[in-house]
């Protein structure tokens, strides 16, 4: 915390000095400023109260790239503030390894996430993407956003943001993010036996010229995520379902192994308005990713591995990737139709530690986006076309009565699916592109204090690639079909003092696909809470419960060597029902929560598995604070 305060003070005075120096440098100006010092001080004192959440807004870098110009006011709501992990923010629609900051897999969306070729080491992408999509601020005053999570059993999280406007046209700032989680199973000491160490630093600059013809942003992101793995609880399949969960007293399957995912991103965006409704732009992004898996205890962990190919003493596998992405484009509007047309070039190279030479991939594609919007009705479409014939089309329609979307595309295999060279696995494939069709539709009924939205999603994938039970990639030649039905429900009761929110998924997997797509049939997440304002309507509060239910299924397992999830059919994850009880309060710019996670674990040795061999978080008290500072 001292380091954060020192850094914020340093940047504050550095920028404050710069902004003062640029107001004028001659002696007459200095004298004039001296004469007006008292009056200006009085003005400053009288206007301090003006700065706050109503005067502070931001825009995302992704919005700027697409041509959106709307700034969003900083969040001051208590809703869902108690959810500090991505796992909970996504309403537990993911698998993880039972701890804050561990690798994630989406339960219901098995379609490709990238049109560009990616590394395939994507289980930590959610943590990276939260930081990568920069927020550029219009602050009117210096602004600090501090979020501190003090989780029980050695789980902590800190997010610190400092930003300020140098003047009306320039904004500068930095983010610091930190996750530190102790092991929840197989710890060798009561405190400080780390499972996750994650840190990120992001520096950003945003500029808009006085005549609003030029927009520029630039950012540098340094991301480092370390997982000190355990391999999960050491048990025999015939002992399932487990009656006693020993957590930190458990024997684990791996000792002293380490995964590292280090990424850097340099991004520069430039936009120039040639005509009132016509702009040209360029975006350049340099990205690196360094992946490693280290096991210095190979002789003790040997039973975990299916094979050892090169070194019988230690495993020191690594993978390095770098890419230079360029986009140039035009965007504007004609009547109510907004357009964005662009060309992309991506030069990518990669190398495993056992390779003698780097491999290169050149990607070229063109694309375009169209958007029509009138009142609450909008239509969006986008298409990307690669030189090799692959494509991606996305269409969306939204209005007050229904939402619909359709996605169709041919996607290249990622690097990991096609090629891997390490101490425990080797493969070299020439997989075909994956074909995806996805149709989603939902109806919205919004009447007084009731919102109800039934939905359906139909997914077909041809040439689907997955990691088999032997932890190697396989391409399925047949068409895979699975459907997800469900609904969202929101109720306000007793003049909205009691609120109920519910999200339900019902999954239907085709008979020929059940051995490949493993999802729970039923998945439900509810939030029931009391909301009011105490102390003369000055302090908003919420008190309630989160309820999570997942039906039994053979969930995907996780392999730290390839840092990916793979299918299995021997370890069944049983039905489980979990509740969290929370209390939230807001005092001016300070928000506070207290939450009893896994409240319904009344037996110390009770529990459930969230992923094969990895128990879900046991009962623990979590505390959190989020504080905005202005001026």
Protein language model regions, located:
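Gram-negative bacterial Sec-dependent N-terminal signal peptides
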Residues: 1-22, 26-28
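Exposed, low-structure sequence patches enriched in small/polar residues
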Residues: 4, 9, 19, 141, ...
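Intrinsically disordered, low-complexity boundary segments flanking structured domains
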Residues: 12, 129-135, 529-533
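Membrane-proximal, glycine/serine-rich, low-complexity loop/turn segments characteristic
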Residues: 19-240, 257, 272-278, 398-402, ...
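Structured extracytoplasmic
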Residues: 91, 95-109, 299-305, 319, ...
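Short hydrophobic/aromatic-rich motifs at helix boundaries and adjacent loops
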Residues: 103, 115-118, 129-134, 173, ...
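Short structured motifs
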Residues: 130-131, 157-160, 253-254, 313, ...
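Flexible loop and strand-edge segments within Gram-negative outer membrane beta-barrel domains
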Residues: 194, 204-206, 212-269, 289-301, ...
